[in-house]
Curated annotation (Swiss-Prot):
S-adenosyl-L-methionine binds at Q274, F303, N308, E324, D351, D372. One of its GO terms (biological process) is rRNA base methylation. Pfam families: TRAM, tRNA_U5-meth_tr. GO terms for molecular function: 4 iron, 4 sulfur cluster binding; iron ion binding; RNA binding; rRNA (uridine-C5-)-methyltransferase activity. It comes from the Bacteria. PROSITE patterns: SAM_MT_RNA_M5U, TRAM, TRMA_1, TRMA_2. SUPFAM superfamilies: Nucleic acid-binding proteins (SSF50249), S-adenosyl-L-methionine-dependent methyltransferases (SSF53335). It catalyses: uridine(1939) in 23S rRNA + S-adenosyl-L-methionine = 5-methyluridine(1939) in 23S rRNA + S-adenosyl-L-homocysteine + H(+). This is 23S rRNA (uracil(1939)-C(5))-methyltransferase RlmD. Its EC number is 2.1.1.190. [4Fe-4S] cluster binds at C83, C89, C92, C169. Coiled coil: none annotated. It comes from Proteus mirabilis (strain HI4320).
Amino acid sequence: MVQFYSPKKRPAKKQVKNLAVTANALDANGQGIAHAEGKTIFVKGLLPQETARIRLTEEKRQFAKGEVITRLTTNPERVTPPCQYYQHCGGCQQQHVPIDWQRTTKAEVLSHLIKRETNVVISAQPVIAGAEYGYRRRARLGLRYHPKKGLVMGFRQALSNDLVMVTQCPVLKPQLNVLLLPLWQCLKQLSVVRDLGHVELVLADNGPLVILRHLSPLSEGDKQLLDDFSHHAQVMIYLAGDNGEIAQLTTIEKEPFYQIEGLKLHFAPTDFIQVNDEINHKMVAQAIAWLDLSPNDRVLDLFCGMGNFTLPMAKRVDKVVGVEGVPALVAMAKKNAELNQLDNVQFWHADLSADFSAMPWAQEGFNKVLLDPARAGAAQVMSHIVTLSAEKIVYVSCNPTTLARDSKILLDSGYQLTQLRMLDMFPQTGHLESMALFIRK
C-alpha cells in the first residue's frame, strides 16, 4: 500500500501586538505602569502621564511587558540621562526618572509589600538618601577580547551577556571614574590580554585599589606595565590568578580601610563592604539610634561581616557578640576589634542556615539584636531570636520579600513593627534596601 504524507500546516507566526497606552504610575524598576485590554502593562522607559505606542515583549494572563516604539507625549519632569551608555548598559534603569520619584516609588512599594504580607500599615519614609550620582565605591567590570575590537572593558547589557564598553560611569565615585580610561589603555597592552576575566575597582579611605582576575600567568613585562600604572595613578594593584589567592603586585604597601563612627575598619580587597559609603554611615547611625544603646546592653549582631555594625555598637554597650558565616570576615572582624582597642566584643564563625544551638554564643542572653542577612533572609535564625525575648530588634535587609516573610515570625511572637525605612543605597537602579525596627510589646 502506498502511503501519502501530508505535512502538517505550520502554526501561524504569532503577531507582535502594538498598541497605544498612557502610564499612570511607576514601579520600583522605573517602568511605567499602564492598563489596556484588561491587563496591567509594564513599559520600560515610560513615565507617568506619558503616552506611547508600544510593542508587547511578553504577555501573560494578567499582565504584560512592553517597550516604547514612539513616545507620543513627554512628561516635562523627564530627566535627560547624564550617561552616554544609558539604555545600552544594564547597570542603571532609572536615569530618566527624577530622583525624588525614584525614592518615593521605592518607599511606597516597600510599604505596600509589608502591608500585603503582614497587614501592618506603616510608612517607609523619610527615605535614607544621599548623592544620586558619584556614590559607588566598588564595581566589577567584565573583560573580553574580540579579534576586531580588541579588549572590551565594561558592564553587561540588559538581558544579555554581551559587554558594553565604558570609559566613564557617573554612578562611580569620581576617584574611580577617572581610572576607567587609563586602566583600559594599560590592560589592552598586556601580553595575556586574551586571558583576562574581570577587573574590580574599590575606593578605600586611603586610596583606590584594582583587583585584576587573569586566567594565564602574567609576564614580567605585564607586571611592569601594571606597576607603572599603579604609581602613575596612585592605586594599589592586586592580582587574582587561577590558584584562588590574591597577591599584591605593587610596592605601595597600604592595607585598605574605611572609617565609620570614629573607627578604622581594615578589609581585604575581596571582602564585602557596603557599596555606598554615605548611606552606610547613615544606616549605622540609624540602627544605633533605634536600638537606643546604653552601657548595660548586651547586643547580638547576626551576619556581622567584618564588624560594620558590631564595632560601632561596642563603643556604647557592655558586650557585643558578632556571628558570621565567612571565616575570612570573622578573622578580619577580630583584627579590627584589636586595632580599635575594643575588648568587649567577641566574634564567632557559624553557619546561620544550620543548627547552631550548641555553640557557646547561642547559650548567652541578649537584650538587643541586629541582623543584616543576605538576600535569602534569616528564616533559620528567627526562632532563636524569638527565644531571646530581646527588647528591640533591628533588621537590615537587601531583599524586601524576605524581610516581609521574616517579619511575620516576629509579629506573631509578640513584636510590633514600629519603624521602617527605605535605604536608597543604589540610586538610578531598581535595587531596594531597607531597615526595620521591632519592639517587644
